[in-house]
Amino acid sequence: SAAEAPMDKDIAFENVSFHYGEDGPDVLENVSFTVPAGKSFGILGGTGSGKSSLLLLLCRLYAPTEGKITVGGVDIADMPARYVRENVGVVLQEPFLFSRSVQENIGICGASDAEIRAAAVTACVDGDITRFSQGYDTMVGERGVSLSGGQKQRVAIARMLTKKTPVIVFDDSLSAVDTETDEKIRSALDRDLGGATTIIISHRITTLLDCDNILVLEKGRVSQLGSPKELLAQPGIFRKIYDMQMSIGEEEGA
């Protein structure tokens, strides 16, 4: 039945428009693209581009005003919202951590010790954790160690990895780590994700260059869509932002 159709299939946004409230302005306007199953798909967009709304729609937190979102040809509106959310792992830019041990934060969904450790290694946070006074039993938050933004993001990535969902979304969730760590995490994820469909939302182009395809979203519309190579070869916002970020990167590296 459509109710709990498998979600390890192509995800398609078909002519999706969306606005909040009855007569709010369109946040997304006639957006169409396909995320092939098991591939990595980048979404580049600044503030107000509509990228966060795409995520809210994919997680069934809102419904499109027009158009539909399908997984393997099945409209997600016909699936239980709970089921959709259980199958889409999301790592937010500012993740929520519980005032519990690091171990409990990562294994909140019932992962074994070995799975927790493996996830932390993939998320490049195992080294940090083992340096804490109590290692994985170190408390997080007010009564324990206060984690940096980058450490929080990596703990949240490890937590999401233990869920083993068929779809994974990173919502600017590598923004607080430096470019080198970002690269390390991404290559570890490529190695360990084993067939998950991965959507990476970012404003940092280097984070997206390894994706199979990239969507450039501008003011709620599809501005460009293609492989990184194709987008770098054509004049447009992607190339412009790439050149800008690369020149800033060179100054930082000097």
What do these predicted ranges mean?
Residues 4-254:
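ABC-type nucleotide-binding domain
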